[in-house]
Amino acid sequence: MSCVHYKFSSKLNYDTVTFDGLHISLCDLKKQIMGREKLKAADCDLQITNAQTKEEYTDDNALIPKNSSVIVRRIPIGGVKSTSKTYVISRTEPAMATTKAIDDSSASISLAQLTKTANLAEANASEEDKIKAMMSQSGHEYDPINYMKKPLGPPPPSYTCFRCGKPGHYIKNCPTNGDKNFESGPRIKKSTGIPRSFMMEVKDPNMKGAMLTNTGKYAIPTIDAEAYAIGKKEKPPFLPEEPSSSSEEDDPIPDELLCLICKDIMTDAVVIPCCGNSYCDECIRTALLESDEHTCPTCHQNDVSPDALIANKFLRQAVNNFKNETGYTKRLRKQLPPPPPPIPPPRPLIQRNLQPLMRSPISRQQDPLMIPVTSSSTHPAPSISSLTSNQSSLAPPVSGNPSSAPAPVPDITATVSISVHSEKSDGPFRDSDNKILPAAALASEHSKGTSSIAITALMEEKGYQVPVLGTPSLLGQSLLHGQLIPTTGPVRINTARPGGGRPGWEHSNKLGYLVSPPQQIRRGERSCYRSINRGRHHSERSQRTQGPSLPATPVFVPVPPPPLYPPPPHTLPLPPGVPPPQFSPQFPPGQPPPAGYSVPPPGFPPAPANLSTPWVSSGVQTAHSNTIPTTQAPPLSREEFYREQRRLKEEEKKKSKLDEFTNDFAKELMEYKKIQKERRRSFSRSKSPYSGSSYSRSSYTYSKSRSGSTRSRSYSRSFSRSHSRSYSRSPPYPRRGRGKSRNYRSRSRSHGYHRSRSRSPPYRRYHSRSRSPQAFRGQSPNKRNVPQGETEREYFNRYREVPPPYDMKAYYGRSVDFRDPFEKERYREWERKYREWYEKYYKGYAAGAQPRPSANRENFSPERFLPLNIRNSPFTRGRREDYVGGQSHRSRNIGSNYPEKLSARDGHNQKDNTKSKEKESENAPGDGKGNKHKKHRKRRKGEESEGFLNPELLETSRKSREPTGVEENKTDSLFVLPSRDDATPVRDEPMDAESITFKSVSEKDKRERDKPKAKGDKTKRKNDGSAVSKKENIVKPAKGPQEKVDGERERSPRSEPPIKKAKEETPKTDNTKSSSSSQKDEKITGTPRKAHSKSAKEHQETKPVKEEKVKKDYSKDVKSEKLTTKEEKAKKPNEKNKPLDNKGEKRKRKTEEKGVDKDFESSSMKISKLEVTEIVKPSPKRKMEPDTEKMDRTPEKDKISLSAPAKKIKLNRETGKKIGSTENISNTKEPSEKLESTSSKVKQEKVKGKVRRKVTGTEGSSSTLVDYTSTSSTGGSPVRKSEEKTDTKRTVIKTMEEYNNDNTAPAEDVIIMIQVPQSKWDKDDFESEEEDVKSTQPISSVGKPASVIKNVSTKPSNIVKYPEKESEPSEKIQKFTKDVSHEIIQHEVKSSKNSASSEKGKTKDRDYSVLEKENPEKRKNSTQPEKESNLDRLNEQGNFKSLSQSSKEARTSDKHDSTRASSNKDFTPNRDKKTDYDTREYSSSKRRDEKNELTRRKDSPSRNKDSASGQKNKPREERDLPKKGTGDSKKSNSSPSRDRKPHDHKATYDTKRPNEETKSVDKNPCKDREKHVLEARNNKESSGNKLLYILNPPETQVEKEQITGQIDKSTVKPKPQLSHSSRLSSDLTRETDEAAFEPDYNESDSESNVSVKEEESSGNISKDLKDKIVEKAKESLDTAAVVQVGISRNQSHSSPSVSPSRSHSPSGSQTRSHSSSASSAESQDSKKKKKKKEKKKHKKHKKHKKHKKHAGTEVELEKSQKHKHKKKKSKKNKDKEKEKEKDDQKVKSVTV
């Protein structure tokens, strides 16, 4: 910037004027100076004189050069003679003072003059001046000052003066410039740029806004003309406006969105725990803090801590939706606060309307909600009076039910009706319908009842919800008082809420769509409908599902104020109004769920409140989530939802009855809504044969996130959005029992009912799946039992036209089988009606408000109530850790991915639940724990039969939850469950402290209770029924242990929140996944709604297996849980990454599985069996049980797996966590996963990514999990191997069950192969790796997990199969097998870990293998007794692998063809697997004989297989690492830490291995061939892991059964699981005890153990074979890489990874290398064939899974029992392996 310095002559200092250019004109300088000095041109003129030359500038155009100094004088305008002598005398003075002295002034002209001199050469100036003048002159035209020439001369003819408007002169020359009297006419703008079509001509140029067009005519924009015609007042932009009739009256803020305190739209809506009402966070905190005793402004309960406030995410979402839709600004609404109180009554009206619409009984039920309406809107006097009566009873509790106060009669029925009617008339909905009227009535009530209604609204929000509670008071005002009587009443209250719910739609309307009365009617009705769907349907459904709980749903969010009836504050926040009210009904009055609810129902209501508007779940959903979710809390949510929604809902009524209902009422409401949302999303994601696809479609918006992330998360969103969309979805939903729930999902709002009714049990499950639904579910377990069934059912019918679904009792108490055509049809009809209604009135609102609430609901309700501990990050999975039973569910939603993932899982689980429900309804009668448990058990069995592990899981969790939480901690547990489930997702800020408090108290207590109860339930369920009890027992034990672990986690997080929570927070995301998996299982047993919600999606497939595993693992988990906490911590990070993979793979698999689902349904049972076997394998006990159970459930599981690979993964992950505690389970599970991989290889990959990641993350804590998933079998990526090394510390020697049994916390020492060490260092290492691996793992996992899983699958699957047939012996064997498997897993894990870090170990392993070659002799002698059992186990495992990869006979022949046979075997095995699969189903005895035969054959091959598996493990880990990194290159790099040595060794040993392989083939043809087959299979699996796994599981299960026969024989002996199935029969004994563990370590180190074990059995041949294997592995790597590239990049990575890993890990890769070399040539063909076969087997796998599910359940108990035995033996081996693993870990840490 140039500048000129000026100073007034009277001043001493110069000021500066800056300008652009080299010069500034005098005119401009004057203007600038005058401007700077604030002088006015009219006052004076300025005289500018050059300070150096004393030259006075007179010409305005004179240019003053920059940096000049001038002196300024003020002179009169006329001008004055210069008083200074600086006039132009002076050309004598130098222009620049700096140059010539002033002495020379006479001789030189000033520079200023010089610059104007044309002839500088002759000028009288110094050369410097001349130069400067020349420079100035030359640059003058370029001076910016001169850029724009001043207009000179006449302007162009078209130019008109801007002042006078006349042409001929510029404005500066305008003759009127001096004329002060001249007033220029109004300037007419030109319509430049405005299309003529947008303009309308006007004749009057003076018309406002008239513009001159280019045609010379005047026109104004059409829109302006319209606006002018309307005559809008133009107000200052920021002046507070009075509520305009158009905006305020047309789109009044829904009452549910109004804060009861400030009467304005809620900002940062929070739910107060006492009464479930929602307020602005600031308002309620201020009110509480300003009151002396922290008195609730609505229910006047004292000591309500502001920290207990739960963020009402649903309501917040509703508010956001409302604001977005209406452009509402709080300022405007501030004057609307009075209406809010009236609005609460309208909400009951809406509910009432809805209920009448839905069904009159519900309307009556809605009466409690109606009570507020009574006072608010008196027009429907009769209705109001009845409502008032009912509400009166509630109103007193409300203590602020002015409207209901008039008729504080406890006649809820009357109240509801009145409320509905009055609100109807009041609300804008009046236009649309009585239902619609509520909105109108609401609006009118707003205006007329502002004071009284304001109070009423406030009271309704406070007292209304209390009335909702009061309705429970119908059911028992105690419920209203917080006692939440487990009767239909509470649900009715919610139902009554529906009367209030009318405002609900209206409020939903207002909430989300407050746009205009018509819109409100349209939207409001839709909103109300949606609210009803969300709130009431949620509530009712939830209530239905939860039984009475759902009646609160009628209060459902649609009538936020009525919803307030449960929690008055929730009136506004309860846009749907129901959730908070429901919460209130459950918690608000006397018995806020503070104790029961970690975060009281309000916690739920807050989130529900937010979602409430969109869902009517804000309050209702919250209430649902909290209230109903407990009822629905059973993690059966998905499958149960699908299969047994009605039955489960009825069961929920039965199970929790009133207590559960009351406690879980709000939770269930919220959770139910969430579940609805999630279900819708989850359905789509699930793409299960069940309405999964429908679900996802309905909630497609959420489907994306669900698919991408955890089901629960997107599920929650889906819930909210899906609610509105779900209507269209409903047809798909009805596909299963859950189909109804799907349809139900279609009616997002209506969801509540459905949920309550069909899903209450599933809801529990679903609760775990979805945050919000979890909230519902949390209560669902309780609510489920609530008698609301009938009313709710009616209400449900009204909305759904499915009386049973509406009837909570009918739904819960009496198992309403959605499979029942009539029930299904009723539900569909109701759904159709509801959809129509919803679409008519609520769709817009649902679309806007619901979608977000869905996520919020899921997250909010489940997680919100999750104790803060778990919910450090409300939506992180971390919470799930704390959710032992219910928080896991939340965590599912939470788990970062999991909010969606849970959603996805929830969707899957819901789908599965539908099936599970249906099947479980069939099997409902025999439940271990009372009706609920029986139903859950039966549902689980039904689910197993149906092939849904998720249903079982949900059922299990529900059972566990309900039995443990409901029966033992009926209120507390339920509350805790709701709180966990609801608090975590919903709890935003307020819930944190209280959440922690509640969690520490209730959740911790619950977990503690659940721990004993889980254990007690274990025994209880065991006593309750061998099969059912076993299933449940296993689930229960899992819950107990896991809950204990979760309790520990919970406590840990509390006691060490910074450290543990920080740890858990990162892991929590994973742990929320893994925890939501583990805890999903835990919560499946305990409060698995949320975990199920999240995990359900991931684990839909995994869940069936996982459930069983969890059942088995739960026994183990009791001991293992503590480690599992660590493991889960580690796992959580892994899981975090894995869920991503899981999502991708899940989607992949879902797509594949969805397509395959139905095709596989028949074969699903077979494959399911295998998959279950595989999954169960990780924990032989569990596997045994899951074998049966999974055989039954495998179809379902397969469906789940196929539909929800992530779920399966999650199950695996969670089981993996547990298995992480017990590597045996890990081993078992890996086979299971392999088997499952067959059906869901991608899923397996996800699981592996996740499970492995779990192992990685939780390797320290539960490395076994990873092991079983990725390296458990024998294939672990270097990451895995590192993890496994850490795991080796735990030395999976301790089975999960062992670990669980050792719940005392043998974690550090026992490390139980849970590999707690890895949790610590591997966790971080692997977390980062896992993230990389997760990105690559889906690819690598596809291949690797397949090989690993396949091998493991083969081993444990056989074991599992054996358990199926001989559950007890099998379980023993399985236990041993688990131990062995655990060892193997740990060794393999170590191998995997050591594959990179212990590739050193490879040399070491070679030494090991040499040693173990020698040792085999010794061990053979030492462990000959175990040899047979181990042989059987190894045979079982190996044969299982062989069978899973090929028929045993085919494999035997293929084995003989060692190298060539491997590819052929791989191909035949796949076919044979199918054959064996069929054979297995048709001739299990034959299979057993075959198994014995093949076992003998495979005794050596089994070891080889294990070695191959170990190699696979390593390669898999290498793959994992490569996946982490870049795939194969990273395999080399990552694996280099672990596998590089193997690579180097491989180079050396590759030749050796082929030689050894030849020797091994010579010496042990079977063994070598088995190895080759294994290797080939591994390669094939790598390349075609999916297909292979699919094929393998069937065959594996056939093998299992055959091997089971063998194991039956050897069952007594199997001490440790065949740590390496590939060990020879001679080695089997050894490996059973010491050898097994040592080899595990070796394998863990660099899979040396596998090869060592093989070497033990093969002797030096093993070593040679190892080298051969290395060579072949390299060969196979190349071929596998090529083949896998052909197969898929994932598989390509996986296969090459497997092969290189095999090559890389000579020790661990010995056998694997054999397989690799064997399969190297055949790898391409094998992999291709395997892929095809696996696809085929995928289908079969599902069937087998279904069959196995049933068998697995029964076997699970035995497995759990055997796990204890195994634990003992595993402990011994564990100590040995610990030492080895420590060494390996050291190596691994070095390599890492």
From Swiss-Prot:
Q: Where is this region: Interaction with RB1?
A: 982-1139
Q: Which GO terms describe its molecular function?
A: protein kinase binding; RNA binding; ubiquitin protein ligase activity; ubiquitin-protein transferase activity; zinc ion binding
CDD domains from the entry? vRING-HC-C4C4_RBBP6
Keyword presence, Cell membrane = no
Domain (DWNN): residue spans on this chain: 4-76
Which intervals of the chain are annotated as region Disordered? 326-347, 371-410, 532-601, 621-640, 645-799, 847-1290, 1321-1348, 1360-1665, 1682-1792
Q: Tell me which tissues or organs this protein is expressed in.
A: Highly expressed in the placenta and testis. Expressed at lower levels in the brain, heart, kidney, liver and lung. Overexpressed in esophageal cancer.
**CCHC-type Zn finger ranges:** 159-176
Q: Cite the InterPro entries for this sequence.
A: DWNN_domain, RBBP6, Ubox_domain, Zn_knuckle_CX2CX3GHX4C, Znf_CCHC, Znf_CCHC_sf, Znf_RING, Znf_RING/FYVE/PHD
Query: Organism's domain of life?
Result: Eukaryota
Q: How does it get modified post-translation?
A: Phosphorylated by NEK6.
Task: Output compositional bias ranges, type Low complexity.
Answer: 374-393, 685-719, 1692-1723
What function does this protein fulfil? E3 ubiquitin-protein ligase which promotes ubiquitination of YBX1, leading to its degradation by the proteasome. May play a role as a scaffold protein to promote the assembly of the p53/TP53-MDM2 complex, resulting in increase of MDM2-mediated ubiquitination and degradation of p53/TP53; may function as negative regulator of p53/TP53, leading to both apoptosis and cell growth. Regulates DNA-replication and the stability of chromosomal common fragile sites (CFSs) in a ZBTB38- and MCM10-dependent manner. (Microbial infection) [Isoform 1]: Restricts ebolavirus replication probably by impairing the vp30-NP interaction, and thus viral transcription.
What does UniProt say about this protein's domains?
A: Contains a N-terminus DWNN domain, a zinc-finger domain and a C4C4 zinc-binding RING finger domain. The ring finger may indeed be a U-box domain.
Name by which UniProt lists this protein:
E3 ubiquitin-protein ligase RBBP6
Which species does the entry assign this protein to?
Homo sapiens
